Amino acid sequence: GKAIALGLAERGFDLVLNDIAAQAGVLEETAAEARAHGNRVIALLADVSAKVQVQAMIAEAVAQMGAIHAVVNNAGILRASDVEHCPEDYWDSVMDVNAKGTFLVVQAVLPVMKAQGYGRICNIASIGGKHGAPEQAHYSASKAAVMGFTRVLAQEVGPLGITANCICPGIILTDMGRVNLDDPAISNAWKARTAMARIGAPEDVVGPVAFFCSDDSAFVTGQTLNVDGGIVLS
């Protein structure tokens, strides 16, 4: 999320950044870095899995910024467990943030974009939604849901001047992914499966996100773009 925020700021986007209350410090640090590019940047706390909080966040964003031209749904969590022993709360929490959170943000922002006659929606899924891994069934299901949701959404909002697209990052060295990738054996195994023979950096996702959030993608909708260094080829 931070790399996307700073990358969009570098490209001239004004930003509304969001995170949960527990990450307030990190959120404000990111906002401060983004403002250094001369952009207008605000930071709003909200849990995307809570409808009331999402609606309040969107209302505040419109009140402060006047419009919402693009949305990037990037919130996500991962809690590892095999299917047989997966606690119900693991399943629920992952689905709530990854899938329902995307839905709730889109649902809240659509009236704004419809009134504008313009909007760009970029949902972040994962290559895990296409090629699952052991102990990630609930994560894989949540990201597959995001892809399916995006395809239907694109059909519904296309006539309104709104596009909806999806990005599937591969193995990226984020804070969430670092837990496993710090193990050289695991990291090297993923590199061996990737055509470009390296682990992705968060900055690798920025360009595709910027494309889907701009008029460069004006006639592109309902698409899922793999940003994975070629891991789908393995």
Regions found by a protein language model. Name each.
Residues 81-84, 131-137, 159-160, 197, ...:
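Active-site loop immediately N-terminal to the catalytic Tyr-X3-Lys motif
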Residues 106, 142, 150:
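Active-site helix of classical SDR
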Residues 111, 155-159, 218:
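Alpha-helical segment proximal to the catalytic Tyr-Lys
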Residues 126:
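Residue(s) in the substrate-gating loop at a strand-loop-helix junction
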Residues 130-134, 210, 221-234:
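Short C-terminal tail/terminal secondary-structure segment
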